[in-house]
A protein has these predicted regions:
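Conserved active-site and SAM-binding loop architecture
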Residues: 1-243
């Protein structure tokens, strides 16, 4: 994939990808609701940005060019799609053990409503990119019974089943949706990190926002992903591919 313009990195931890794009000589900026590390270029309510763009109102998307110019890579919040969230849809969930059945039901209905809202945002974001001819890659976890496996507008373009093989901290099977573009196929092997379990990480503080620990991406993984699946760029650690 050739990027003649700029890469726009959306949501938490996208700054890691931004930095690696810049190291590779590609201009990039990141956008997030939070700025916990003091490095975010643009602190925007991306949920409102998506809603406005979908409704035809002025938005950030108006400044993003289509065709072969710009690229969006969006690490869309997964908190209500994850398998852990799915386990909280049952009365028998451990978190509800001290609640009455009505209280359990209310908690479940609240979670389902939040999931519906974020599902809608993800679908709208992809629709906006599709209709405007903007290249976009959306990332979301793909382990066990994650909600999007059976309940999304289209299947993922590709799944990275073991991110540790490309230098990440987590195994964390991850799906990627490519809109108006196709992935290249390379394999830059780098398995040199101590494995971290998602269950050992802290939970997020508010709805739709994952904790920094759970969403952490290693710079090595970001660089290897960019070279393997976006730029088609060989590295010293690149392996031969069947594609």
């Amino acid at each position: 994939m050739e990027i003649k313009g700029k890469v726009h990195c959306f949501f938490e931890q996208s700054g890691t990808f931004k930095n690696e794009f810049i190291k590779l000589g590609i201009p990039a900026e990141d956008y997030d609701i939070q700025n916990n590390f003091g490095e975010t270029d643009h602190t925007d309510d991306l949920f409102r940005v998506i809603e406005d763009a979908y409704d035809g109102k002025p938005s950030l998307f108006d400044r993003i060019r289509g065709g072969q110019e710009d690229l969006i890579i969006a690490f869309f919040p997964c908190i209500y799609f994850s398998c852990l969230s799915q386990m909280s849809i049952y009365w028998g969930c451990t978190n509800y053990r001290k609640l009455s059945y009505k209280e359990r039901t209310n908690e479940i209905l609240k979670r389902v409503a939040n999931r519906e809202y974020f599902f809608g945002l993800a679908a709208k974001m992809l629709c906006v990119a599709q209709e405007r001819g903007i290249r976009l890659i959306m990332e979301n976890p793909w382990s066990q019974q994650t909600y999007l496996k059976a309940n999304f507008i289209l299947p993922p373009t590709m799944v990275d089943n073991n991110r540790r093989l490309r230098g990440d901290y987590f195994t964390k099977p991850t799906a990627y949706w490519f809109i108006n573009c196709e992935p290249t196929h390379g394999f830059s092997e780098q398995c040199d990190k101590k494995s971290i379990r998602i269950l050992d990480c802290k939970a997020g503080k508010e709805a739709g926002v994952c904790s920094e620990e759970r969403s952490m991406i290693s710079p090595d993984y970001a660089r290897n992903f960019i070279c393997d699946f976006i730029l088609g760029k060989e590295q010293i650690n690149s392996q031969l591919s069947l594609f």
